[in-house]
């Protein structure tokens, strides 16, 4: 026996069950379109670390930085962590991260890549 709810598709039902509202999803989409993202490379004790910086921590929380970090690490097959409002990924993945962020809904013109390498 199949139950059908009028006016709702499977995604709506799943969102309701998991607690994600349309407003939260809409706010996250708007934030992604407006967010300014800086991608830079640091050299730490001979190893490269790619930093994806989202500016302030409130914007990062609205963007769902934890889920984003998990997805980036999985897609890049690299380790990483979250610090305040930025994601650290092991290795030089600047161009790949830019492509992935565009796929996730960020605007290309709002993603800035620093070409230099910072020594720390």
Curated annotation (Swiss-Prot):
Protein family (similarity comment): Belongs to the SUI1 family.
Disulfide bonds: none
UniProt cross-references to InterPro entries, sorted A to Z: SUI1 (IPR001950), SUI1_arc (IPR022851), SUI1_arc_bac (IPR005872), SUI1_dom_sf (IPR036877)
GO molecular function, one term: translation initiation factor activity
Superkingdom to which the source organism belongs: Archaea
Protein's name in the database: Protein translation factor SUI1 homolog
GO biological process: formation of translation preinitiation complex; regulation of translation; translation reinitiation
Pfam families per UniProt: SUI1
């Amino acid at each position: 026996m199949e139950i059908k709810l009028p006016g709702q598709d499977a995604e709506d039902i799943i969102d309701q069950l998991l607690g994600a509202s349309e407003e939260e999803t809409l706010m996250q989409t708007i934030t992604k379109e407006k967010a300014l993202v800086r991608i830079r490379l640091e050299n730490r004790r001979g190893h490269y670390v790619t930093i994806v910086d989202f500016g302030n921590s409130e914007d990062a929380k609205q963007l769902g930085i934890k889920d984003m970090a998990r997805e980036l690490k999985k897609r890049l097959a690299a380790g990483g962590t979250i610090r305040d409002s930025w994601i650290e990924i092991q290795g030089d993945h600047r161009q790949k991260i830019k492509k992935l962020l565009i796929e996730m809904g960020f605007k290309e013109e709002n993603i800035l890549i620093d070409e230099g390498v910072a020594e720390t």
